[in-house]
UniProtKB/Swiss-Prot annotation:
The gene is iraD. The keyword Iron does not apply. Keywords: Cytoplasm, Stress response. This is Anti-adapter protein IraD. It comes from Escherichia coli O127:H6 (strain E2348/69 / EPEC). Interacts with RssB. Inhibits RpoS proteolysis by regulating RssB activity, thereby increasing the stability of the sigma stress factor RpoS during oxidative stress. Its effect on RpoS stability is due to its interaction with RssB, which probably blocks the interaction of RssB with RpoS, and the consequent delivery of the RssB-RpoS complex to the ClpXP protein degradation pathway. One of its GO terms (molecular function) is anti-sigma factor antagonist activity. HAMAP family: IraD (MF_02010). SUPFAM superfamilies: gpW/gp25-like. GO terms for biological process: cellular response to oxidative stress; DNA damage response. GO terms for cellular component: cytoplasm. InterPro entries: Anti-adapt_IraD, IraD/Gp25-like.
């Protein structure tokens, strides 16, 4: 009887599962914002005209934007257990969003900042 052996390479468990989860969530969130085919509502990912002129200081509009963005992100990213969306800076052509979140299976908070500048989104390093 001939035996065949199948060699399998399993990923190493180095204790970095939490780190890879955090990196994966940040990467996927950035893709939600920067993809031209994003499932997020267009106003949430490229609604910069709303912030131009007199609307940039409209607290009611800012609050609405944060609530809508929070709802959309929680719907599209099931690994987020809790999420708070804050606007750090609102200028005519720049918007800085801070996403403070807790992930399932992760005991440490994660902050992820996104910056709208020169017509596209940029990310800052997560904390």
């Amino acid at each position: 009887m001939m035996r065949q052996s199948v060699q399998t390479v399993l990923p190493e468990s180095t204790g970095n599962n939490t780190l890879s989860l955090r990196d994966s969530v940040c990467r996927d969130l950035f893709q939600l914002f920067s993809s031209p085919h994003s499932p997020l509502p267009i106003l949430l990912v490229s609604g910069m005209p709303e912030w131009q002129g007199h609307n940039q200081s409209d607290k009611l509009l800012q609050s609405w934007y944060c609530r809508q963005l929070r709802s959309a992100l929680l719907f599209h990213e099931p690994r987020i257990a809790a999420l708070q969306v804050n606007l750090k800076a609102v200028y005519c052509h720049e918007l800085v969003i801070s996403l403070d979140m807790m992930l399932y299976h992760d005991d440490e908070p994660l902050t992820f900042d996104l910056v709208w500048q020169k017509g596209s989104w940029h990310r800052t390093m997560p904390q």
